[in-house]
């Protein structure tokens, strides 16, 4: 009887995996097909990223370099058509969707991971950005890889996952400096959850940070020799020189998150977070919340003090889809 139950469980898991991969493949194929037939010209940022891809460097005025490298690869293979410039977006989103599913499977089991992958794939912001090229796309991909690697480190303590975490952190930072939130969230998660505190004093964290620093160091040197151009631009974006009390901007940012995540899902997320904060949540749920709430709170504060774009908290929704 036990053997039959195990076989049935294995069959269900295989069926769910097959269905998830099928859905991801179908959505990705449809999105690529729509890109191929689209007449949409490159908008301002996309055109700028494409121009960077023609002159590869370790950094640029407004962004780190990875977006230019990605475009360089796709246009080298397929030419400089608009669809080729944007081709990496649906492909990377497919990878992020799979990583989100694996995160949910590790935390909550086999029953939810199928829907987690599908939910991420069909989020309004993900659907929209699949037809554009932006720095958020590779950022979300490497964030999801880093989150899964972190989960595996805490579970297995294997060195290989620390190496993967360092690579994901480094490439994420080369995508967009918002990857730095991951360090804040991880520090908070490990400090709050007693059984994870060992990580903060382990060689795993040193290895991960060292690898990330090696990967990001050329961009740091580029910034140094370029008068900290990108850092200055980030400071201009933060813009704390004006009115520091903008309740309307904070409210507007929070309202825009319903458009990013979807109004129904955003409502469900708020209800879930309130429920977890009011009741006794598990360590796994607390851990996941640490990769959601701090980001939304930091960017909401930024909106209150100055302004914030709707996508600035995008990485929070990797964990949110699993929650």
Q: What are these model-predicted stretches?
A:
Residues 24-27, 116-124, 169, 173, ...:
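Short helix- or helix-capping micro-motifs
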Residues 38, 171, 182-282, 292-295, ...:
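Transmembrane-lumen/periplasm boundary regions of multi-pass, lipid-linked membrane glycan transferases
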Residues 55, 116, 161-177, 212-213, ...:
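Membrane-interface alpha helices of multi-pass inner-membrane proteins
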Residues 56, 260-263, 286-291, 295, ...:
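Hydrophobic/aromatic-rich transmembrane helices and adjacent perimembrane loops
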Residues 65-69, 79-98, 129-133:
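Loop-to-helix entry region of an early transmembrane alpha helix in multi-pass inner-membrane enzymes
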Residues 95, 100-122, 141:
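Transmembrane-helix signature of polytopic, membrane-embedded enzymes
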Residues 105-111, 146-161:
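Membrane-interface transmembrane helices that cradle and orient dolichyl/undecaprenyl
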Residues 125-139:
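Short acidic/glycine- and proline-prone juxtamembrane loop motifs at membrane-interface regions
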């Amino acid at each position: 009887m036990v053997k039959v139950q195990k076989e049935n469980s294995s069959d269900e898991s295989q069926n769910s995996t097959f269905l998830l991969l099928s859905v991801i493949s179908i959505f990705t194929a449809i999105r690529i097909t729509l890109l191929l037939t689209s007449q949409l010209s490159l908008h301002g940022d996309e055109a700028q990223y494409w121009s960077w891809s023609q002159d590869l460097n370790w950094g640029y005025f407004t962004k780190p370099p990875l977006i230019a490298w990605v475009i360089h690869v796709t246009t080298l293979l397929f030419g400089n058509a608009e669809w080729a410039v944007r081709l990496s977006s649906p492909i990377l989103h497919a990878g992020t969707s799979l990583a989100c599913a694996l995160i949910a499977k590790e935390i909550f089991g086999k029953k939810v991971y199928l829907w987690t992958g599908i939910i991420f794939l069909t989020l309004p912001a993900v659907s929209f950005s699949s037809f554009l090229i932006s720095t958020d796309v590779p950022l979300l991909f490497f964030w999801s890889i880093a989150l899964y690697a972190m989960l595996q480190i805490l579970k297995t303590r294997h060195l290989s996952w620390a190496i993967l975490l360092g690579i994901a952190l480094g490439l994420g930072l080369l995508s967009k400096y918002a990857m730095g939130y991951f360090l804040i969230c991880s520090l908070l998660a490990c400090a709050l959850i007693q059984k994870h505190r060992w990580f903060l004093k382990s060689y795993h964290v040193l290895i991960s940070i060292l690898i990330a620093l090696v990967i990001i160091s050329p961009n740091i040197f580029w910034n140094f020799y370029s008068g900290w151009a990108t850092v200055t631009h980030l400071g201009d974006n933060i813009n704390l020189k004006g009115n520091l009390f903008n309740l309307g901007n904070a409210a507007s940012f929070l309202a825009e998150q319903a458009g990013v995540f979807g109004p129904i899902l955003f409502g469900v997320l708020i209800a879930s977070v309130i429920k977890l904060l009011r009741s006794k949540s598990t360590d796994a749920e607390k851990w996941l919340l640490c990769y959601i709430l701090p980001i939304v709170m930091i960017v909401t504060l930024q909106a209150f003090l100055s302004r914030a774009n709707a996508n600035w908290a995008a990485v929070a929704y990797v964990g949110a889809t699993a929650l």
